Amino acid sequence: MNDVGLVELVESFPDAPTYRRLRIETGLSPKSQEAAERGLANTLYGVSLLKAGEVIGMGRVIGMGRVVGDGGTVFVVVDIAVRRDHQGQGLGKRIMAALDAWLRANAPPSAYVMLIADGDARHLYAQFGFAETAPASISMAYVARGPGSSD
């Protein structure tokens, strides 16, 4: 069913419990409550997709996306997610269009705007001017171990 018209994009980001649930529902890696609260507090800009007719907190948030960074030199597009039962309707593109508009209005011309594309999502991001950087540069990840962890 195509219910794009029943979905509202709002310039706000879900609370930590909703964020954590949506990450799991969309196949993103799980985050602890502490990590979610800290991270969301540092969002520069974020959007949520809300399904009309749903009770808040009962599956109403069906998508999200946000921008993090230092607000001047580096911006990172993160947490682009649409619930699986709503994928394939252009909702990811709506999220990216909102983030792209915000970046165009707020990122200085010399800023570096980046993201990590999972699988075929790179095709969506290419529509907004993102290009693969390999082999000139590659993405690397560091897994934080936190206080008290042993190596």
Regions found by a protein language model. Give the residues of each.
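Residue-level recognition of the GNAT/N-acetyltransferase active site
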Residues: R83, D118
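Conserved acetyl-CoA pyrophosphate-binding loop and the N-cap/start of the following alpha-helix
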Residues: H86, G90-A98
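Hydrophobic adenine-recognition pocket in adenosine-nucleotide-binding enzymes
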Residues: V67, I80-V82
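Conserved beta-hairpin
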Residues: L44-G65
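Conserved GNAT acetyl-CoA-binding A-motif
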Residues: M96, L103-A117
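Conserved catalytic-core motifs of GNAT/GCN5-like acyltransferases
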Residues: S110, M114-I116, A126, A131-S150
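A conserved beta-turn-beta hairpin within the catalytic core of GNAT-like acetyltransferases
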Residues: G69-V77, Q87, P109
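Short amphipathic alpha-helix that is part of the acyltransferase structural core
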Residues: M1-Q33, D151
